[in-house]
């Protein structure tokens, strides 16, 4: 029966060749490829394509056909290309990655075998499963194709479970269905199809797990769809009423039978009480929750409820109960666990004046985290705890935090120990870096795809290399390759992806160049524009949000029109997404206005930019005015912002601003900027 393969299998997407089909250059029976090791490509086996200055007409014609959904033509072009040539590799990979109704599973499987080190193996695996579902071979072939591995798609689950049922192995069918059904978010039609075909086969306990999981994910309709099969209709009706804010929620909660009152019931009742602003009563229920993650069904959802409730209690002045709630968390993901430990440590230190207890929580963040953002926060707050009697040496902790100079807390720590500069040197590639980079097949493919005008496929390769390369020098070469194409968005992504892996990429994570000299912006204004643009659009000049915000600094057309009029400029909506200098000029003017609105406060301006100026003003009324306060009070004010997204946004833009000030003017002053704002 299917089993969970090691994590390596999932990550590298060991491709299962699903059925015989129109394979690349051959006819094959069912094949299985094992876990794919991420080794260096063997370039001696590759027949070099013509130089990049030569025509790429054949490759482009194949990619054009693919873009037009003419799969037959794309496959014909692929077959006409020289065997083992780079162009054939590129087109075979692109066809397999594209998938679609006309791409046989054999094509996908052969591409995976031919290109084991290329990106997108999980996507290829998923496309293979969908192709198998369409081709609908015999149950024996399906079972052999999956070779004991768990499907990754809805189609794969259905075809494999169906095959096991046809072969009389219902136990194996359940082993396929259960892990998928318990957690996967599905469209209503797919959900109904599973219930119709397999509803009676799936155990009631799995239906119950799914019901609760969907409620935790705020997918109420999905949860209600399986409530009957779960044998928990009364709980589902009550929980749905709580989620929707129905007036009869309390009555329905009371009517839930004792047999259905497990952890999910506690969650629904606690959520109801919180929404009724009965925070102490809600806290008492939350503290009754089991510590076992399996019993909680979704431990991370429980953490979110604890966080929201704890902040309400802090606002009520009950720091002690707030601490107890977050300290007893069972958050599962490392990111949520680190966030929970921060809340516990921060409440203990700043609310309860207990540096020893706070230190234990902050130290736990350092154990959980790998990313510079989290590590710098851990060491900074360990230093703060040590300053007021906690264990350890405050200066040592601050020095460790300061080594992460591109982060908010790293910069604060740097000023705490008297550092005048940030360590953001641009990586310098060695001769070895250049040799290694030049021999990578994926790099050659990027250049070829760019020459053919297909940057979207090239970007997949950029991202994959940014997630694999370990040398800052090679990563710098990759970013420069993108910049030379004018793709500042991808140059930034390279730095961000590598930086998130814990690689010291220096200035690579904060590149310059997207704002041209034609932009009418001062030096400090340019640093501010870069800081906002990095967060808002990630330097995607053509970005358009769902709300209609456009371009580098995500300006609304109406706002941009008013700004252009004030500046005596001709307004052009089209230029907002095509002319970075135009967008940046108007955006800098808008930022200047917002800074004026908040008396020069960067903190309030950034909070208002993200959540709206009205909310920023409301938070001033609720939490006090950070303007003119000492730096520790300003940091506390930022951490009190009730919106997680806005808290993070203020810190991210602030750290960006300091990095770009350093890069443009060779100085930074995060303490002065937090306390005094714009001078």
Locate the predicted segments by residue.
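Structural register within alpha-helical repeat arrays
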Residues: 61, 92-95, 128, 160, ...
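Compositionally biased, proline/threonine/alanine/serine-rich low-complexity intrinsically disordered stretches
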Residues: 24-55
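TPR repeat positional signature
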Residues: 58, 88, 92, 108, ...
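Solenoid-like repeat scaffolds
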Residues: 44-52, 75-86, 97-100, 109-120, ...
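Residue-level detector of the short coil/turn that links helix A to helix B
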Residues: 69, 136, 168, 218, ...
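Catalytic glycan-binding domains that act on GlcNAc-containing polysaccharides
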Residues: 84, 93, 108-110, 114, ...
């Amino acid at each position: 029966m299917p089993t969970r393969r090691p994590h390596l299998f999932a990550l590298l997407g060991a491709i299962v060749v699903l059925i015989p089909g129109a394979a690349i250059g051959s006819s094959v029976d069912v094949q299985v490829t094992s876990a794919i090791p991420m080794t260096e490509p063997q370039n001696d086996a590759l027949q070099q394509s013509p130089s990049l200055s030569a025509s790429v007409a054949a490759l482009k014609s194949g990619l054009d056909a693919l873009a037009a959904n003419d799969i037959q033509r794309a496959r014909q072009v692929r077959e006409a290309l020289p065997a083992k040539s780079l162009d054939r590799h590129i087109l075979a990979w692109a066809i397999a990655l594209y998938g679609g109704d006309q791409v046989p599973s054999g094509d996908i499987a052969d591409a995976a075998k031919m290109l084991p080190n290329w990106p997108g193996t999980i996507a290829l695996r998923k496309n293979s499963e969908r192709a198998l579902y369409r081709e609908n071979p015999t149950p024996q072939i399906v079972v052999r194709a999956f070779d004991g591995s768990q499907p990754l798609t809805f189609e794969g689950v259905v075809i494999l479970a169906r095959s096991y049922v046809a072969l009389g192995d219902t136990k194996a069918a359940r082993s396929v269905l259960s892990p998928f059904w318990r957690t996967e978010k599905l469209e209503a039609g797919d959900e109904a199809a599973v219930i119709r075909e397999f509803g009676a086969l799936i155990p009631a306990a799995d239906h119950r797990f799914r019901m609760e999981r969907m409620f935790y994910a705020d997918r109420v309709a999905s949860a209600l769809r399986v409530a009957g099969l779960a044998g928990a209709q009364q709980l589902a009706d009550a929980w749905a009423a709580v989620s929707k804010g129905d007036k009869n929620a309390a009555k329905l909660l009371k009517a839930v039978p004792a047999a259905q009152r497990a952890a999910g019931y506690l969650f629904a009742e606690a959520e109801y009480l919180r929404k009724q602003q009965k925070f102490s009563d809600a806290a008492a229920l939350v503290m009754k929750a089991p510590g076992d993650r399996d019993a909680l069904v979704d431990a991370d959802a429980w953490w979110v409820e604890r966080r929201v409730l704890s902040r309400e209690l802090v606002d009520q002045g009950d720091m002690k109960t707030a601490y107890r709630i977050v300290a007893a968390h069972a958050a599962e993901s490392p990111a949520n666990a680190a966030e929970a430990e921060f809340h516990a440590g921060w409440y203990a230190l700043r609310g309860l004046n207990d540096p020893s207890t706070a230190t234990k929580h902050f130290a736990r963040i350092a154990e959980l985290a790998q990313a510079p953002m989290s590590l710098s926060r851990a060491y900074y707050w360990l230093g703060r705890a040590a300053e007021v009697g906690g264990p350890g040496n405050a200066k040592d902790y601050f020095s460790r935090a300061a080594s992460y100079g591109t982060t908010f807390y790293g910069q604060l720590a740097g000023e705490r120990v008297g550092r005048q500069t940030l360590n953001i040197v641009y990586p310098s590639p060695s001769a070895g870096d250049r040799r290694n980079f030049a021999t990578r097949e994926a790099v050659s493919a990027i250049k070829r795809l760019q020459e053919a005008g297909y940057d979207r496929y090239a970007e997949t390769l950029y991202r994959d290399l940014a997630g694999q390369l370990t040398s800052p020098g090679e990563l710098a070469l990759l970013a420069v390759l993108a910049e030379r194409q004018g793709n500042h968005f991808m140059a930034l992504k390279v730095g961000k992806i590598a930086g998130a892996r814990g690689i010291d990429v220096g200035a690579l994570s904060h590149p310059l160049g997207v704002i041209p000299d034609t932009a009418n912006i001062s030096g400090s204004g340019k640093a501010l524009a870069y800081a906002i643009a990095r967060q808002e659009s990630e330097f995607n000049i053509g970005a358009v949000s769902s709300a209609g915000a456009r371009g580098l600094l995500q300006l609304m057309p109406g706002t941009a029109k008013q700004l252009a009029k004030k500046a005596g400029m001709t307004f052009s909506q089209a230029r907002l997404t095509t002319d970075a200098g135009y967008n940046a000029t108007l955006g800098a003017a808008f930022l200047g206005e917002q800074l004026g609105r908040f008396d020069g406060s960067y903190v309030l301006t950034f909070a208002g930019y993200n959540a709206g100026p009205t909310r920023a003003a409301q938070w001033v009324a609720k939490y006090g005015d950070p303007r003119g306060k000492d730096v520790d009070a300003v940091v506390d004010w930022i951490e009190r912002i009730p919106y997680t997204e806005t808290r993070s946004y203020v810190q991210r833009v602030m750290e960006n601003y300091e990095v770009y000030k350093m890069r443009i003017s060779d100085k930074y002053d995060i303490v002065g900027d937090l306390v005094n704002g714009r001078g």
